[in-house]
Amino acid sequence: MLNLSIKKLEQSLVLKNDGYLSIFFLGTGSAFSKKIYQNNIVIIKGDTAIFVDFGTRSPFALNLLGHNVSSIDNLILTHSHADHIGGVEEIFLFNRYGFNRKINLIVPKPYLDILWEESLKGGCSYSEYKDTKHLNIYDFVNYIEPQIIDIDYKEKRLFYKINISGIDIIFFQTKHLPSDAYEIEKHHLTFGL
């Protein structure tokens, strides 16, 4: 039987619990929401907190909850809209230069290359030289690769699975962008969980 409860946060967000699965919404708004932030969540179980997406308003929302981006150990990203990745550059740079640490990034491999080359490289790569080259994504993250799985679905889609500290996560390819494309092959790579 599912034991579900909704609780109002009365103090700063605690990123660990007694081992039960909890989901906290950093925001519930649309891409352009200024008051209720963007639709980004934190999955918490035991000592593990997994942030799912981190949009442009997420650093501010996290600060209001008593944390900064150095509190992030695990990050899943679903697609490259700014309301889902707009705060990631701050995570990368703040952790590298403020705390000399890397976070765990959990995304399917085909999306990792898109994420870096088409979204994050310009703001992160040119911060310094390392061995006479600009930085790459592995200078900022410990990459954890979900494994592709075969699921019999009515149309061809990519599915991936990973277990992070007892939390099973399945990624499934979505038809999100562009909105007028009907075939999955014509869509930019995006995922749901």
Label the predicted regions.
Residues 1-193:
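Binuclear metal-dependent hydrolase catalytic cores
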